[in-house]
Amino acid sequence: MKTKHFFNSDFTVKGKSADEIFRRLCTDHPDKQLNNVKWKEVFINRFGQMMLDTPNPRKIVEKIINEGLEKQGLKNIDPETTYFNIFSSSDSSDGNVFHYNSLSESYRVTDACLMNIFVERYFDDWDLLNSLASNGIYSVGKEGAYYPDHDYGPEYNPVWGPNEQIYHSRVIADILYARSVWDEFKKYFMEYWQKYAQLYTEMLSDTFLAMAIQQYTRQTLTDEGFLMVCNTYYGNKEEVQITLLDIYGYPSTDIICIEQKGLPTPKVILYIPGGTQPFVEFLNTDDLKQWIAWHLKDNKHMVAFRKHFSLKQRQEGETFTGIDKALQYIAEESPEWPANKYILYNPTHLETENLFNIMMKRTEQRMLEDSDVQIRSNSEATRDYALSLLETFISQLSAIDMLVPAVGIPINFALSATALGLSSDIVVNGDSYEKRKYGIGSLVQSALFTGINLIPVISETAEILSSFSRTEEDIPAFFTEEQALAQRFEIVEEELHSISPDDPPREITDENLHKIRLVRLNNENQPLVVLRRLGGNKFIRIEPITFQEIKGSLVSEVINPVTNKTYYVSNAKLLGGSPYSPFRIGLEGVWTPEVLKARASVIGKPIGESYKRILAKLQRIHNSNILDERQGLMHELMELIDLYEESQPSSERLNAFRELRTQLEKALYLPEMEALKKQILQIPNKGSGAARFLLRTAMNEMAGKTSESTADLIRFALQDTVISAPFRGYAGAIPEAIDFPVKYVIEDISVFDKIQTNYWELPAYESWNEGSNSALLPGLLRESQSKGMLSKCRIIENSLYIGHSYEEMFYSISPYSNQVGGPYELYPFTFFSMLQEVQGDLGFEQAFATRNFFNTLVSDRLSLMENTMLLTESFDYTPWDAIYGDINYDEQFAAMSINERIEKCMNTYRGVAFQNSSKSIDFFLNNLTTFIDNGLTEIAISDLPYDIVQQEISQFLQGSNEWKTLDAMLFNLDKGDINGAFRKLLQSAKDNNIKFRAIGHSDNSVPPFNNPYKSLYYKGNIIAEAIEKLDREGQKFVVFADSSLLNSTPGTGRPMPGLVQYLKIPATVVDSDGAWQFLPDVASSRVPIEVTELENWQVLTPPQGKILGLKQFKLTAGFPTEQSRLPLLENSVSEDLREELMQKIDAIKNDVKMNSLVCMEAGSCDSVSPKVAARLKDMGLEAGMGASITWWRREGGMEFSHQMHTTASFKFAGKEFAVDASHLQFVHDQLDTTILILPVDDWALEIAQRNRAINPFVEYVSKTGNMLALFMPPLFTKPRLTRAL
C-alpha cells in the first residue's frame, strides 16, 4: 500500500511564497486585507492573547491555596517555588528536625496539588502528612544543600537543610479538600469560551489552510489534494465529504477524512493536526486504515495519536473496551481487531460548510471533559495528561512561523511532532524546561507530570506572542511579489509590466553571492520570473519573496539563430485546465423544474406529493456538478417517473414526464452506448442504484480503467431480486432516541393487523389478552429483549425501527432456537414470522429498508461481485494441481493411516478442509489431539457469518457470557441439540485455546441459490474472507465448509477456483460410514458459466491499443531532451542488455541515411515512417509493428477535431522501440534536432504531452495512407462541452 506521491503543479499559486499564497486564499477577515501592512501584527497579537487567557490550572491552584491561607491568617506562598518533600528518615534536637541524606520524593506544591497527592491521601493513614519526621512544605526542593562542616556528632551524617518547614502538609491538604480545583477551573473555562469561541474557530481554519500551503509548496501535497483541501476550507459541500475519524466508534476530537465526491473510488486525505505532515493522501480508505495501523506500532506515534481522543473515551471498564485498548489491539494486529473494520467503524459525516465551528465545539467539550478527569482523578487509567487546547495551540504556532519567522517561538516543532500528531515530549530551546522540571520520586517520569509542566512553556510562548508588536517598518516589507521585485531589482512597479522577453535580464547578487536574474519567459503566457543558474544554459525558478527554489521548474537559456537574441523558455508552467471528460453529463437538453412545471401543468389540479418529489429531484440534478452524483440522481428521477406512471397510468402529466425521461436517457447515454443503455435499463423496474453502479462500471471499462466486467455484472443484477428493484422503502427521518443504525422501518405497525394470521390468538399468547397483532408486538419485543435477543428493535410513535439485518434474524431465529421453555422462548420466532408475512411480494429490503441501507446494499453487492470476478482473473492452478491433481491422489490418500493423513495435511499443506457435516465434525473432534500435536492453531467455519458473530465468538473464547446471537445460531445449526456437533466444535476450540473464525458471508442474501451468478457471488465473498483471515505465515488450520465452496465451479469467463485451491489445501469429506476421503476437483467444473447469448457490447474498449487517459496531457518539467530520455531507455531492459541496446540506438542516430529522413513538416509521418522502417531493416535490425497515436484537440469554441501521428519501430529483447524521424513537426526543445527513439509507450506519452493531446488513443501498429487518414479516437472519448466552458 502506498499513498499517492506524484506532484505536477499547474495551480495558480505556484511560484509564490507561502506567505503570499496564504493572504490570497484565506477568507476575508478584516485583519487579512491584502494591502493592510499591519495585518500580521494584529493576527499574531490576537493569537497570543487568546493563548495567554487560556484557563491555567497552575494559576488556579496558586489562587486557591493563597486564599485559603489568608482566611487562616497565614502568609502566602508561591507554590511554584515551594516544595512538598518526603523523607525516608529524620531525627530531632532542641526542637529542630534534621534530615540527612534521605530525601526520597520532592514535588513543587503546584505539581502535588494537580496530581492529587493531598486529596487522594486525605482519608488514608495520616501519619505521612502529619509527621514532621516524614514530610512537609519546604522552601527548598531537591536542590537542598548539605552541611558537612556542621558537626552534630559522630553518629550523624551530614545534615540536609534548610531544616525548618514553612507549613505542615495538612495545612495545604485541608484547603484543597474544602475547595474544588475543578469547580474553579470550570468557571474560568466557561468565561474563556464565551470570549474566544469565534476567534478560535478562525484560528482553526487559518491553520488548516496554512498547513496545506506549506505542504503544497514543499511538494508533499498534490494539486488534486490541495484543491480538495481548499474546497474543504471554503466549505464546498458539493465537492468534498468530511468524515470524523473514529476508532471502534470512539470519535476523535479533530482528525478528519476528506473525500472527493463523484469518483468511482474516491481519493481520501487524512488531516491530523499537529502531525509532521498534517495532510496525508491515499488512493482509498483501506490504505488510510492500514497506514494508521502501521504507525500505531511505534510507541511515540501511539502516544501522540491517543491525544486526539478524550480521556473519557480512554478509560476502560469491565463491560466495554476503551480507545486505548482498541488502539493497542489494532497495533498488535489482533485477528479480532482488524484495522480495516475498527478504524472508521461508525463514520460520522460533518457539515463541510460549518466544519471549523464544529471542531471548535468539539475542542470545547473535550477540554471540559478532560479537565474533569484530570483534576478529579489521578488513577492509572487517566494519568496521561491530555493538553487538549494547549497542544492544539502548539500545532498552530507554525502558521505564525510561516508568516513572520522572526517571532522566535521557544518550541522546536520538528522534534515535537510525529506522523500521528504531537507528543508531550516537546523540546524547548535552552535549559528553561529542565529548570522547570524540578522533582524526584515515583511520579516524576509520568506523563501527567510532563503534561502539567508544559503549561508554563505555553504561557511563555503566549507572552512572547501577545507582546510582539512592531512598527510598520519592522514588519517584513514585501506584501506582494511586485513590491519585492521592484525593491530588490531597484525599479518602479510600473516598469515590471513593460519588461518583455526581448529585454536583457536584470541581475543582482543575493546574500549567498548567487547571481539572481529577473526575466520574462518567451513561451505560453510569458510570466515574469526570478532565476538562479544551475549550470550551462539551465536555470531554476525561485520564489520572488523568499528566494526559495521552486522544485521542478527548469528554465533554458536559448539563442534565436536568426536574430542572435537570447531568450528564456520553460514548459514547467504551461497553461493548464481541468481534464476534459467524455462522460461529462450535459443538461443542455434536460428541462429545468420551471420548464417542467409549464409543460406538465394541468388546469385546476394541484401539485401532489409524487410530483413534488420529481421536481425536487430535477432541481438537485441541475444543482449538482459532480459526475457520479449527477448520473445517480438522473437514474433516481427516471425511477420516480416510472413509479409515477405505475401508480397513476391515466395522469394528464404523463406525456411531459415521459418526455423528460427521454431527455434524461439521452443525456446519460452517448449514441455509442445505445446497446448498453438497453441492457442496463431493461433491468426489471429499472432500479436506480444498480443502474448508477453499472453505468459507472461501463464508463470505466470504456476508458480502459477496469477489466471487462460490465456484462457479467448486468447478468448478476438481472438475477438478484434486490439489486434489480427500485427503492420503495422508508425515506423519512430517524428519531434521535434511536441509538443504533437503522436498517428497516415499518412506518405504521397497524399493517400487522392486515396479514392473514392472527398471532395474538395463538395458545402461547391467550393469557396476554391482546386484541390484535399490532397490540401483541410490543410484548413480543419486550420479552425477546429480556432474553437477550432483538436488542436493536424499537417502537416509537407507532413506527417499528429495526437495526438487525434480515440475514441475522434468519440465522438466529428458528423453531430450533426459539422453543417454548427454551432459553430464548417463542417470542422472537413469532416476531420474525410476522415480519416475513407482512413483507408481501416485495421482499423485506424493498418493502422496509431505509434509503441509505438500500443504496448501500445494492452498491455493495455489485462491488462485491466485481471483486469476486477479479478473484478468478489469472488464477494459477499449477501449485494446487502439482500436489492434488494426480488422478490417483484419492487412492494415495486412502492408503495412509489416519495419523499419517493428519500429519501430511498439517505439515505439508498447512491445513485441510472438511465438508461441513456433523459426521466430519465428530471425526475431527475424535482426532483433535492428533491435529493439535501437529500444530493446529485455528478452526474456520463457513456456516457462521463473520460480520454478525465473530465478536461474540471472541467473547465466548475469553469466557464472557455475552454471546446470545451466536448461541441461537448454534441451536439452529444443531437443530435444537444442546450437545450438537457445531456447539461441541466451538467448545473444543475454547478448551484447547484454538482460534475459531467465522468466515461465512452476510449481505442479506440467504443461500442456497439456484442461479450460478448468485452462487458465485456468495462463494467469492467467503473465499475472500478466508484468504484474509487464514492465508498467513505460521497458521495451521482446519476449515469446515459446504461442499460447493470447496472445489472449482463455473465462473464468469473462466472457472471459479474453490476455497481449497486458494488456500492450497486438500478438500475432504467423512462419508456415512465414517470413512475420511479426499474430494478431487472435477475437471468438468473448471469451465465458464454458460451464456446463451453473448452481447455485442460485452467488450466496451477498442479491440486493439489502449486509451492513454481521459484527460488533457501536458508537459510537466520542460521539453524532453536527449538527457531526460536516457533513463527511459536504460530502464527498459535488464542491465546486462543495456550496453547492446545503446549501441543499436547510437548506430541509428549516427546513420547518414537515417538522418536524411528527418523532417519537420506537418503530416510528414505518413511518408517518412515507411522509409524509416525500410532503413531499419537494411541496417539488420528486427522490424517491429510500429505504433500510431491519435487524439482530440480543441479548435476553438465548441469544435473539436482529431490529429494523428505514426512511427516505425524495431524489436530488441522482446520489446518494441519507436524510431520517429518526423516528431520535430511538434513543439520541442530548440536544441532537440535528433531522431526520437523510445520504448513505444514512452514515445506515445511524449507525443501526447508535447501536443497537449486530449484523450489520446494508441494502437501498436504503424499506419499509412487511408488507414492513417481514417485513424481517429473512439467516438465515446470525444469531449462534450457546454457554452459555459
Swiss-Prot record:
Transmembrane spans: 402-422
This protein's record includes keyword Kinase: no
Subcellular location: Cytoplasm; Secreted; Host membrane
Coiled-coil parts of chain: none
GO MF entry, a single one: phospholipase activity
Cellular component GO terms, alphabetical: cytoplasm; extracellular region; host cell plasma membrane; membrane
Membrane topology: Single-pass membrane protein
Cited CDD domains: Tiki_TraB-like (cd14787), toxin_MLD_like (cd21058)
Keywords linked to the UniProt accession: Cytoplasm, Host membrane, Membrane, Secreted, Toxin, Transmembrane, Transmembrane helix, Virulence
Domain of life: Bacteria
Entries under Pfam families matching the protein: MLD (PF11647), PMT_C2 (PF20899), PMT_C3 (PF20900), ToxA_barrel (PF22771), ToxA_N (PF20178)
GO biological process, one term: symbiont-mediated perturbation of host G protein-coupled receptor signal transduction pathway
Alphabetical list of Gene3D superfamilies matching this protein: 1.20.140.180, 3.40.50.11550, Secreted effector protein ssei (3.10.670.10)
Function noted in UniProt: This is a dermonecrotic toxin. This osteolytic toxin, induces bone resorption. Potent mitogen. This toxin is associated with the severe progressive form of the atrophic rhinitis, a major respiratory disease in pigs.
Other information: Closely spaced cysteine and histidine residues may provide the toxin with an affinity for metal.
Protein name as catalogued: Dermonecrotic toxin
